[in-house]
Amino acid sequence: MQSYLGKLIQHEAAGGVLLVIAAAIAMVLANSPAYDFYNGLLEIPVSIRFGAFEIAKPLLLWVNDGLMAIFFFLVGLEVKREVLGGQLSSVSQITLPAVAAIAGIVFPALIYVWFNIDDPVAVNGWAIPSATDIAFAVGVFTIFGKFLPLSLKLFLLSVAIFDDIGAIVIIALFYSQDLSTTSLIVACAGFVALFLLNRFNVRRQAAYVLIGVVVWAAVLKSGVHATLAGFALAWFIPLKLKNEDGHPMLPHLEHKLHPWVGFVVLPIFAFANAGVSLFGASISDLLNPITLGIAVGLFVGKQLGIFGVCWITVKTGLAKLPDGSTWVQLYGVSLLCGIGFTMSLFIGSLAFEEQGLAYQTSVKAGVLLGSLVSAVLGAVLLARSNAKSKERAEREAARDA
């Protein structure tokens, strides 16, 4: 378990660096003479047709509906593994990160609603600041917290997992469109087929993948957001059953997908969604209630919810601090949870899908501002604590020598 988490954290850290690079390139293109090229690239129409069945979308929506389904599939695999035998398999292990994640969803949403309560359209984006970008958060932690307790990293990962579950529930309940009964029936039939594959110990991964693609397409056509199909499909992948090559199926898929998601899927998503054009925009244009609600929700709401509820939970004896950690270190992690970036941008694209460029620009500005401030202050705080931990470790090593 420890070695797996170490590899996971390394992947997430390197992926976080790529996310920064991809987002920076998008910002440069969106604010340069290459803006038309950047925007035109995202609007390229792409269609897939099988007989009378057709899916036609601009490239941007293929990224958001297709590639992000792979990301949520990986999240589902991680959650299933942790629930069945990992960090989320017992009440004592999940109490603190679970209540922290719930508070980290509720408090930012309340702050956003407070800023936008008088605008019935804008208030639909209440869930945008509720998300945490696990790749960015773990990346910053790994860079600036090398000598901090491993338990603190596990706490951050667990909070992020619960946060992802919350985001999935929110998308399912609040950001799905008018439903198509026929498509839902096809999707349900696909899930039944996957259950039977699992029940009869079918070892061929290709069978699961083929049915999974059909389910994704059916869910996409049904009006339920297609990324939810990715998360649901993961729960039909056997945990211990070995595939045709002799590898346990779920861990094998998880291992294979991690580099693709971290180094391809999420950087492409960041490139496609982070380009905020500031041409002709004034400070007052950017600091509107949507932008402020998101930025303040991410920076203030996340840390207030997570740290505040953790303090109450620990002081009342319902849980304890991660082993070897301090309140200052936990506060630093709470700040990192305010890095919403990819997940916040994704929810923003759903919340204001029909509202046009102005709303999306406000969303992107708020997400980037709140995430940047949270990342910088969290990194500074953890770096100072990390330096003290390093000095302590060096003194102990010298004493032992």
UniProtKB/Swiss-Prot annotation:
Main location: membrane
Gene3D superfamilies: Na+/H+ antiporter like domain
Domain of life, per lineage: Bacteria
TM region positions: 13-33, 59-79, 94-114, 125-145, 154-174, 178-198, 209-229, 260-280, 292-312, 332-352, 363-383
Pfam families xref list: Na_H_antiport_1
Any GO CC annotation of this UniProt entry: plasma membrane
Organism for this UniProt entry: Pseudoalteromonas atlantica (strain T6c / ATCC BAA-1087)
Protein's UniProt name: Na(+)/H(+) antiporter NhaA 2
